[in-house]
């Protein structure tokens, strides 16, 4: 591949060795880093300095906001300034030190996004504690594992998560000694905590512990671990990703350089809506960037049904979303179009085509059709508060048709990105006003080197004219390893390169397109990982089936499956339920499909599977998977790419049918 418009080659590719290492493609980096990666300023040593420098620079800027509740109704956003937040952070840090917790100790944070979440994080940063975020949606089992694995001694928790935290006792109390509520503590919770020899504090009570005391902040280094972020898990236990101060500050410098170069730099005037989980790297680094630029962060009320009300009240300028959220926006707009009548639909379609055509010619979105923006698309922009200029999509692929639609109607830049917890978030980001990048994650951010590694067993060649292979990343943003799992670290970290497991394809302009997974683990559109082999083993317990292939499209939020049913079991069921016909016609019958789906749901409930692991559509094939159709290997292992190719029509039909059902609902 000739060097694309947005990348430069820094190293040549290498042919592989027969029976040894596979071939690797050339090493590329962002065109904006052709003279080297941006270096952080000397006084930016740790994550604490990100906040400290903004307090010094913009003490009176509004930093953290939440809606005031008056007579049970949500009012305007009420703000704490950077200086006010700093004062609380110092008090909280003094209290932490007063109970004997200090540099290098592990501090958990458990709950939905809130000002207290950020304040707790900054107190950890100030005193060199390892911040260990806990997913808001994780149950007691996973929380217990993380507390014990990370050896968390102090945990801050949202009020309604205290009971979940207490359920981790007595195992967790080998390490966990203190719990601090973001709000109040009930008498029952105090009794339960004392029963397990845990000390529990309300927020105000804990802040008073450090009154009148002063502790010097410890010296921090860039190589110090800042946070242990546990991945949401695929098979087995969650993995603790060690991210250092260096990882975070180099990530921020790279993103800052990119946004400045494309004239979309964040400033202290920007307003960000915090609703994606802070325990996820995507939102965490975006909020760190907002803090770095002394911008304002407003928090939602934690209910997706009233998210749109919070958006209207906050009027954010930057909006981040996972594809599932943008899919809902798209579906809602399409529904309004359908309900709007012939004339409105005709006007909308005309305006859309006109603006889209001008954008294809290279016109920036704001110049492509100002009249259409004012007359037709204004309501879409107002639906996002009226001030949004930048929409960032991450955590899973965004469907090209949705990205294209939103780029036109949202009157804002819609950028898709790609990154891993292990790469400290953003590694690729698409470029504004480049419609050729639809369906891609854009070129590399100017802080990493990228190369593809061939995957011969899947037919991907990194040295071909159309380079495809496993995406490998090198740079200072990378994690330093999996906590207490050197074996897993060595599996993905080879010669300084992080092997992502994602298969990518370089585009002519230097953008990257994600096309496959090297291992049978993938993400659904809401960003959840699915371990497909594990699920197939679980669903195989259903007596009515012989074999099953589970599939999840990264642009959809649920799973579907192709099943080879048991002839004996299905015909027996059909006889009992008066479903007539031969075996093939019985398998085509919708009642039979609903029966199989019901059996899957029964097993899923028994095995306590998560919602996104449920199968929502099924195709029954009376012919078992075989070698004649190249669907299995001689050792009877499934050939997933071939299965997808063979059943593509059925897969598309299942997703189409489910979408139609959702629209009717």
UniProtKB/Swiss-Prot annotation:
Which cofactors does this protein require? Mg(2+)
Question: GO cellular component terms?
Answer: endoplasmic reticulum
Which stretches does the entry tag as region Fatty acid-binding?
495-519
Q: What class of enzyme is it?
A: ligase
One example of a Gene Ontology biological process annotation: fatty acid metabolic process
Q: Which InterPro entries match?
A: AMP-binding_CS, AMP-dep_synth/lig_dom, ANL_N_sf, LC-FACS_euk
Q: What does this protein do?
A: Activation of long-chain fatty acids for both synthesis of cellular lipids, and degradation via beta-oxidation. Preferentially uses palmitate, palmitoleate, oleate and linoleate.
Q: Which top-rank group of organisms is this from?
A: Eukaryota
Q: Which Pfam families match?
A: AMP-binding (PF00501)
Q: Which GO terms describe its molecular function?
A: ATP binding; long-chain fatty acid-CoA ligase activity
| Claim: Lipid metabolism is one of the keywords in the record | yes
Instruction: Report the EC number(s), separated by commas if there are several.
Output: 6.2.1.3
Task: From the record, give the cysteines joined by S-S bonds.
Answer: none
Pathways per UniProt: Lipid metabolism; fatty acid metabolism
Query: What is this protein identified as?
Result: Long chain acyl-CoA synthetase 3
Q: Where does ATP bind?
A: 228-239
Catalysed reactions, as listed in the record: a long-chain fatty acid + ATP + CoA = a long-chain fatty acyl-CoA + AMP + diphosphate
């Amino acid at each position: 591949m000739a060097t694309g418009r947005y990348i430069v080659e820094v190293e040549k590719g290498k042919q592989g060795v027969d029976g040894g290492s596979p071939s690797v493609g050339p090493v590329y980096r962002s065109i904006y880093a052709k003279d080297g990666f941006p270096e952080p300023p000397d006084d930016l040593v740790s994550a604490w300095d990100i906040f400290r420098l903004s307090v010094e620079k913009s003490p009176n800027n509004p930093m953290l906001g939440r809606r005031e509740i008056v007579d049970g109704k949500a009012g305007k956003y009420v703000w704490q300034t950077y200086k006010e937040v700093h004062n609380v952070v110092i008090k909280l840090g003094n209290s932490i030190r007063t109970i004997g917790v200090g540099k290098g100790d592990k501090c958990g944070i458990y709950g939905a996004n809130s000002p207290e979440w950020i304040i707790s994080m900054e107190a950890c940063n100030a005193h060199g504690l390892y911040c260990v975020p806990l997913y808001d949606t994780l149950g007691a089992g996973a929380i217990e594992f993380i507390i014990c694995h990370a050896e968390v001694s102090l945990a801050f928790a949202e009020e309604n998560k205290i009971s979940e935290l207490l359920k981790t006792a007595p195992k967790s109390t080998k390490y966990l000694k203190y719990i601090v509520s973001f709000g109040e503590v009930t008498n029952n919770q105090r009794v339960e905590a004392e029963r397990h020899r845990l000390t529990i504090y309300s927020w105000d009570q804990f802040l008073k512990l450090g009154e009148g005391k002063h502790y010097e902040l410890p010296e921090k280094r860039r190589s110090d671990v800042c946070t242990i972020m546990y991945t949401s898990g695929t098979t087995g236990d969650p993995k603790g990703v060690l991210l250092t101060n260096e990882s975070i500050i180099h990530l921020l410098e790279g993103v800052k350089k990119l946004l400045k170069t494309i004239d979309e730099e964040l400033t202290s005037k920007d307003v960000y809506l915090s609703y994606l989980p802070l325990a996820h790297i995507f939102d965490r680094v975006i909020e760190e960037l907002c803090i770095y630029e002394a911008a304002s962060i407003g928090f939602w009320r934690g209910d997706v049904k009233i998210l749109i009300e919070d958006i209207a009240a906050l009027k954010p300028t930057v909006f981040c979303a996972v594809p599932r959220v943008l899919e809902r926006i798209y579906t809602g707009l399409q529904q309004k179009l359908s309900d709007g009548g012939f004339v409105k639909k005709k006007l909308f379609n005309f305006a859309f085509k006109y603006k889209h055509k001008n954008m294809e010619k290279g016109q920036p979105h704001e110049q492509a059709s100002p009249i259409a923006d004012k007359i037709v698309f204004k309501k879409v922009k107002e639906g996002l508060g009226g001030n949004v200029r930048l929409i960032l999509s991450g955590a899973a692929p965004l469907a090209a048709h949705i990205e294209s639609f939103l780029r036109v109607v949202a009157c804002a830049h819609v950028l898709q990105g790609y990154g891993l917890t292990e790469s400290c978030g953003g590694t690729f980001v698409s470029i504004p006003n480049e419609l050729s990048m639809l369906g891609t994650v854009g070129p590399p951010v100017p802080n990493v080197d990228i190369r593809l590694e061939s995957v011969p067993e899947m037919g991907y060649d990194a040295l071909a004219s159309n380079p495809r292979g496993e995406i490998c990343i090198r740079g200072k943003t990378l994690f330093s390893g999996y906590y207490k799992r050197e074996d897993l670290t060595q599996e993905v970290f080879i010669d300084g390169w992080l092997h992502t497991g994602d298969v990518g394809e370089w585009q002519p302009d230097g953008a990257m397109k994600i096309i496959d997974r090297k291992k049978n683990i993938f993400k659904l559109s809401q960003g959840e990982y699915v371990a497909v082999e594990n699920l197939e083993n679980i669903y195989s317990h259903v007596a009515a089936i012989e074999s099953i292939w589970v599939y999840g499209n990264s642009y959809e939020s649920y799973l579907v499956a192709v099943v080879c049913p048991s002839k004996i079991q299905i015909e027996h069921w059909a006889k009992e339920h008066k479903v007539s016909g031969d075996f093939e016609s019985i398998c085509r019958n919708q009642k039979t499909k609903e029966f199989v789906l019901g059996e899957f749901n029964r097993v899923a409930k028994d095995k306590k599977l998560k919602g996104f692991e449920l199968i929502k559509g099924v195709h029954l094939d009376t012919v078992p998977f075989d070698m004649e159709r190249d669907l299995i290997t001689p050792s009877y292992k499934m050939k997933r790419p071939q299965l997808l190719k063979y059943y593509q029509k059925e897969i598309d039909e299942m997703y189409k049918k489910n979408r139609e059902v959702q629209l009717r609902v």
